[in-house]
Amino acid sequence: MNESFSAFVRVLTAVLWGPHVLLLILLAGVWFTLRGRFMQVTKLPGMTRGALCGTQRCGGFSAFQSLTASLAGSLGTGNILGVAAAILVGGAGAVVWMWIAAFFGMMTVYAEGVLAAKFGTKNAPGAIGYVQKAFGRHGAKIYAAGCVLSALGMGTMAQTGAASSVLVPMGVPRVLAGVVFAGLLLLCVRGGLPKAVRVTEKLVPFMAGLFLALCAAVLLLRGSHIPGAVRNMLKGAFSLKAGAGGVCGMILAMRESISRGVFTNEAGLGSGTFATFRTENKTPEQIGTLGALQVFIDTILLCTITALCMLVSPVRDFSPEAALSVFSLVLGRFGKLSAGVCVALFAFASVLAWSCYGMDALLYLLPKKGAAEKRIYMAFTALSCFLGCMSPFLGVLNVCDAFNGLMALLNVPALLVLTPQVFAKQIAQKPKKV
């Protein structure tokens, strides 16, 4: 029975989250890059200032709150453990594949943000709004169901499972880790996304700053090895090893490994739009810019710095379980403990954001949207946190990969169908030929 179920899960995952889906996501990014005339190079840097300035809001979120909330969802354990897995499988050259995927992914997430701002509503929030516009209510319901299942699996169980695998060797019992994660989640998410955003706007800068400080210390102490690390990254980018391990290098950046399925910038899933579409006093184009900035910070900045730390360190075992040894060998016990805290914070931030995304999606599916339904959902989310810490089951996580694929297979085609809406302002401003 178990073997039959495992075989079914493998087939389901291969269909919904195989290389063809990752290729679809990457090609969508290429398409939007060409349609936008490489906006992520020519226009987005200048648009970022306008997108971030101003903090006034009337019931919605400020631009900074939206950015930190979307970063909370994407800055999971994959930013540390996932990068280690990428290098383990694809060598130093896999980092370049992550850059390529992120470069095109910036425009995919830009398109998601623009369309969510145009079509997202209170009753059909975020990506659900534009999926409904493209494929009707039935298509939107399938997408929302995938989002709920991904929130319970990848957004909670996979994150806490990966975090516990790091915390347990440091002396933290699995039960204690599970209880703390679940308890903090229930405490922070009782008010829904608005309350969660007030947490993430403080938590994300703190945890990112702490992690960057650790990485800076490693790079300062091992600075003489940086040129060699960069050289290895560029030389290995198109080697057979990097190609085999990093084909559609996105898979290496998005997932820590098959056993943990931890993703990073979430380009193609539409998940970050649940936070960004609520941004007050911003145009759709500015909201799209926030999404593109999220991908840049997540992958181009943080994942690259993580990779450099690993490549300049004396560590040669880049398995996720040994990832923190990079910090312990260079910075001692303090470095390992601090890195462990970062992993726990990254995991919790992702759990907090995804639990709210899942709640929004669930409320779209339910005809009755009462407090009881919210409490039941949060109980299941807390249970998922606890179970993830206790035992990160491979079969469950493979199913979660399939849920991600379910989201992408509806989200990306919806983006392509609505492409004219993404660049409507750009087309309108194009001067007519006389």
Question: For the regions a protein language model found, what residue spans apply to each?
Answer:
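Helix-loop-helix module between adjacent transmembrane segments
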Residues: 31-33, 71, 101-121, 128, ...
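Transmembrane helix-loop junctions in multi-pass membrane proteins
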Residues: 36-40, 78-83, 92, 153-164, ...
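Membrane-interface helix-loop-helix modules in multi-pass membrane proteins
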Residues: 65-124, 132-136, 288-315
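Flexible loop linkers connecting adjacent transmembrane helices
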Residues: 38-61, 85, 91-95, 107-135, ...
